[in-house]
Amino acid sequence: GKAFDDGAFTGIREINLSYNKETAIGDFQVVYDLNGSPYVGQNHKSFITGFTPVKISLDFPSEYIMEVSGYTGNVSGYVVVRSLTFKTNKKTYGPYGVTSGTPFNLPIENGLIVGFKGSIGYWLDYFSMYLSL
């Protein structure tokens, strides 16, 4: 896949992703907060099409992500992120994608998610997050 690194900002306002209900997560793009203003992050797109888009609009700054969870698994010989769920202090968004394979969950006990990095080829290969304490 093609690696991406959005860097760190001051918060998250919106997450735009796409998924296929038979394969995995495709595109991934975030609207961050940068010192009180929206900052539109780069759209990290799959090499292929056929995905359903989803827009997760957070009620920033009172709503923030407390946990990211999902599944990784094998699609066409690649281990990829098959499903994502975002739990905020107000509600749960998802799951989006295929909830089978190896589950993971990343609860944030202290701090805020302020950025994402990862890799996308046909699907989201992996991702990690920047935290601000």
UniProtKB/Swiss-Prot annotation:
Keywords: Glycoprotein, IgA-binding protein, Lectin, Repeat. GO terms for molecular function: carbohydrate binding; IgA binding. Residues 68-89 are annotated as: IgA-binding. Glycans are attached at N43, N74. The keyword Methyltransferase does not apply. Pfam families: Jacalin. Transmembrane segments: none annotated. Sequence repeats lie at residues 7-64, 76-130. InterPro entries: Jacalin-like_lectin_dom (IPR001229), Jacalin-like_lectin_dom_plant (IPR033734), Jacalin-like_lectin_dom_sf (IPR036404). Residues 1-133 form the Jacalin-type lectin domain. It comes from the Eukaryota. D-galactose-specific lectin, binds the T-antigen structure Gal-beta1,3-GalNAc (Thomsen-Friedenreich-antigen-specific lectin). Potent and selective stimulant of distinct T- and B-cell functions. Shows a unique ability to specifically recognize IgA-1 from human serum. Belongs to the jacalin lectin family. Tetramer of four alpha chains associated with two or four beta chains. This is Agglutinin alpha chain. It comes from Artocarpus integer.
